[in-house]
Amino acid sequence: NNNEDSIKIGRGYISMFQQSLANKNWAEAYMNWKWIFKNAPFAVNGTYTQGPLMFYYLITTEKDEAKKLAYFNEMMSIFEARTKNLDALNSFAKTKSTMGDVLASKAEFYNWTAPNVKNSGYTLNKSYDNYKQAITTINEKGGREIEGSVLQTFFMISDAMYKANAKADSKANPFRTHYLQDY
């Protein structure tokens, strides 16, 4: 039966993906992740939750800038797909994710990787906006407790934005109002 064969093949890729992650064999994990993401995107939540960590390691160890950028773009596509399909993914997840949780994870992985990837479009302002959106979403719509590392990084970025916009007259700083609201 073709359906049974497809299921067996899919389970094999999932098993190899999980084993590759456990062995920290990022290149092998990537090959299996890619098949799962394309052919069985709802087969396992780890495609979305563990995929970004795999990409983080692929990006930090890759020397070729074009490959780094391709990995970065694929990693960001995980968050787009996850936010789009969150309800369907939660329908079979043991631990449900909220939109705020996903956005906080996206902000973290963007901030950890984008500054080190040429042509990623990284800006301090975009990093700030990602964190602000995540924290606002969690506060308005609920989510898990905001992790201390997320808040700490957000405050550090907010402080950097304030300093980048500093003028001799601190009241003339266009970011001042946002900065005060962040705290």
Q: Predicted segments — roles?
A:
Residues N1-Y183:
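Preference for long, solvent-exposed alpha-helical segments and helix-linker "stalks"
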